[in-house]
Structure formats: C-alpha cells, structure tokens
C-alpha cells in the first residue's frame, strides 16, 4: 500500500506529513484513512504533547484529488456529501477535539480542503511563498472541511464571502495581515521555526492548553454569563491538575518546571 501519510514522534511532537507530492498532496481515500489512524494515535498517546502538520514537496495540500473521485459527466450524479461525511467531517472534529496544540506549517499552495484544513488548526505558520486558495466555487461546489465555519471567524464575514465566492489566490503575507494566520517566515526557515514551536509546546502544561482551546471554541456560541461560568469550571479543573502543582512548585523553588500534561 502507498504511504500517503508520514508520521514521526520525537521529543513529544508528532509530525504528520501529507505525502503525495506528485499530486500536491491532494486527499484520496487512502490518505484520509492513514491520517485518521495517526490522529487516533496522537489522541491516545500521552507522550505526544503537540501535533505538527505539514506537506511534502512544493505544496501543502491541493484539497481533494479529483482523479480519485472518477466523476463521469455522462454518468449518474456523484454523492459528494458521502465523502464529506465519511472523511472530512471526522477529520475536522478530531482536530478540534484534540486536547493538545495543533500547529500547521503551510509550505506551499493550500487549496480547497487543504486551505480550510490549515486554517482550522490552532496555530498556522506559512512559508512566504505559500498561497491559500478557496477553490470550491470555481468547481461549482461549497466549502467543506469546516471552511464555512472557520473562514468568518478568522477573516470576518466580508472577507470570508469574498474569499469563498471569488476563489482568488490569497498570499501568506495578506493572510497574516488579515489576522488569519500566526506568522509568515522565509521558506527555508519554515520547518525549523515550526518544529521549534512544537517542541516548546511539548514542554508546556498541555492539560491547561487543551482547556484554553476548548474554552475558545465554546466562546463562539456562549453568552458572557455562560463563558464566565465555563471559566470558573475550567479554572477549577486546571487548579487540580498535576501541571498546576508542578508549575507553582517550580516557581517557588526557582527551577525549570517539568510538566506532564496531566
């Protein structure tokens, strides 16, 4: 079987590389399944404290591999919703629910589901040459992989409408100026910058970071009172964690903390 997903665990970081460079790492069914298997490992393995996603070759991910769908214009209409339900929706839900930081290093073009996958990660770093392309509309399709949810939240409604309906290229620099991504770095520095950040997160109190991630997600729909109550509950949970006790002990002893993520 072809290996469309490369994974490596080192120093608490799982690096996942989309590995179909001849197709700009476009998604196919086998890639989806291999990625799902890696994410299950990341969820279950307590030694994995941070996830880093990137692409092989000159692109990050060009979205769905249209050749994999074998759409025959003269045949019956395909059920594209089935692939969304079977692959993309579980992928988005898994990344959102993962109680660990997820970093995306966009090393080239990110189009369609590749763009929305990247922008849905917790922290997005992009090479200076990278581009984001919401290509759905050019095929007569609607955004998937969480695109219609994440775009208004990271770019604002007006820009989300323009990006999704026009389908124009968006440079990494412009995405950073609009606040859609965390940082743009020179192409040659992307890998090292992303890995340094991931290794930093892997040494941090990731139990609390997971609660921060969940609190921010729930803030999208909560009222102020609901969010204040949630902060109370999460602070109670964080205060009972091993990480909090270690952080305070290390501070008082003037030594570096050794967090466990628990």
Segments from the language model and where they lie:
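Conserved CoA-thioester-binding segment of acyl-CoA-metabolizing enzymes
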Residues: 1-56, 93
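Terminal low-complexity tails and localization/encapsulation signals of metabolic enzymes
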Residues: 1-2, 249-262
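Hydrophobic alpha-helical membrane-association signature
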Residues: 31-34, 87, 117, 190, ...
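C-terminal capping/lid region of NAD(P)-dependent oxidoreductase domains
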Residues: 49, 206-213, 257-262
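Glycine- (often His-adjacent) and acidic-residue-rich active-site loop
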Residues: 55-94, 110, 223
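Crotonase-fold acyl-CoA enzyme core
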Residues: 93-209, 236-241, 246-249, 253-255
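Short, charged, surface-exposed hinge/linker loops at domain edges
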Residues: 216-222
